[in-house]
Amino acid sequence: MPYGDVTAIPTKDVEAVIVSKGEGVLAGVGVVKILFDLAEIVVMESKKDGEPIKPGDVVMRLRGKSDSILATERLAINILMRMSGIATATAKMVERARRVNPKVVVAATRKTTPGFRIFEKMAVEIGGGDAHRFSLSDCLMLKDNHIAVAGSLERAMKVKRSFTKKLEVEVGSVGDAIKAAEFGADIIMLDNFTPEMVAEAVEELRRRGLREKVIIEVSGSVTPENVAEFAAMDVDVISSGYITHSAPALDFSLRVLQ
C-alpha cells in the first residue's frame, strides 16, 4: 500500500510497548488510542494523559498485527512527543508562575502548527494551562493591525459588541492601557511590556479605580525563565507562544516484544 512499511516482513501477531525516554507530563494518549483503534491495534494498558513520566516508563502496551503496528509507529510517537513536550513546558510555566501568583492563568496563543492546533491546545490544557482562542471568532479582540485599519483606538473600540463575548484590546503603552479601560474594554493585553512597564500600568489602573474592572493579560516574549517575574506584577493572565512554538519534544520509542 502507498506509504506502508516496504521493509516489513510477513505479518504476524505481536505485542509492543511504547516507552518514555524523558521526564515530564504525558499527553496525547487519548489521541493515539483513536489512531490505534483505526488500525485495529489493541491497547492492553496505558498511562493517562496528565500523568508524570520518567525515562524507562512504559506508557502503552499494545497487541496487533506487526504490519499495522509498524505502519502507525512513527505517527503515534510523533503525536506523543509533540503533545507531551507542550504539556511539560506548560506545567513548568504554570508551576513557576503560581509560586508567586497562585491565581494567575497561563494561556496559549494561536502560534501553533498548521493542522495541529486542536491537539496542541489540548496539550496545553493537560499541562494545566488555558487554551485561549482557537480562532478569531472566539473573542472580540482588537490587535495592533485592527487598530491600524480603524485609524485609532477609539474608532476600533466602536466594533459591534455582544453580551456573549468579551472585548479584549491589545495595547503597546501604559497610556493606551488606560484609554482601553476607560473606553470599556473587558480585557487589556499588555503586549511586549517589560516587567517595569507592567507594574506601571497596573498601578496607574489601580490609582484611577479601573484595575478591578478589567482582566489584565501579559503577552510577548514570555518564557519559563521570566514567567515568574511577570506573574509577580498582579496580572490575571499570562499568554505565551513559547509553549506551542518552542517547547522541546519529549522523546518516546516503540519496542516490539520478542
Curated annotation (Swiss-Prot):
Q: In which pathway does it act?
A: Cofactor biosynthesis; NAD(+) biosynthesis; nicotinate D-ribonucleotide from quinolinate: step 1/1
**Mind listing the UniProt keywords for this protein, alphabetically?**
Glycosyltransferase, Pyridine nucleotide biosynthesis, Transferase
Q: Which SUPFAM superfamilies match?
A: Nicotinate/Quinolinate PRTase C-terminal domain-like, Nicotinate/Quinolinate PRTase N-terminal domain-like
Q: Which residues bind substrate?
A: 74, 109-111, 133, 143, 170, 191, 219-221, 240-242
Q: Which Pfam families match?
A: QRPTase_C (PF01729), QRPTase_N (PF02749)
EC no. given is 2.4.2.19
GO terms under biological process: NAD biosynthetic process; quinolinate catabolic process
Q: Which GO terms describe its cellular component?
A: cytoplasm
**Which one of the record's GO molecular function terms can you name?**
nicotinate-nucleotide diphosphorylase (carboxylating) activity
The record, for InterPro entries, names: Aldolase_TIM (IPR013785), NadC (IPR004393), NadC/ModD (IPR027277), Nicotinate_pribotase-like_C (IPR036068), Quinolinate_PRibosylTase_N_sf (IPR037128), Quinolinate_PRibosylTrfase_C (IPR002638), Quinolinate_PRibosylTrfase_N (IPR022412)
Q: Which Gene3D superfamilies match?
A: Aldolase class I (3.20.20.70), Quinolinate phosphoribosyl transferase, N-terminal domain (3.90.1170.20)
Q: Which reaction does it catalyse?
A: nicotinate beta-D-ribonucleotide + CO2 + diphosphate = quinolinate + 5-phospho-alpha-D-ribose 1-diphosphate + 2 H(+)
Q: Which family does it belong to?
A: Belongs to the NadC/ModD family.
The function of this protein is:
Involved in the catabolism of quinolinic acid (QA).
> What does the subunit section of this Swiss-Prot or TrEMBL entry state?
Hexamer formed by 3 homodimers.
User: Per its record, how is this protein called by name?
Assistant: Probable nicotinate-nucleotide pyrophosphorylase [carboxylating]
Source organism of this protein record: Archaeoglobus fulgidus (strain ATCC 49558 / DSM 4304 / JCM 9628 / NBRC 100126 / VC-16)
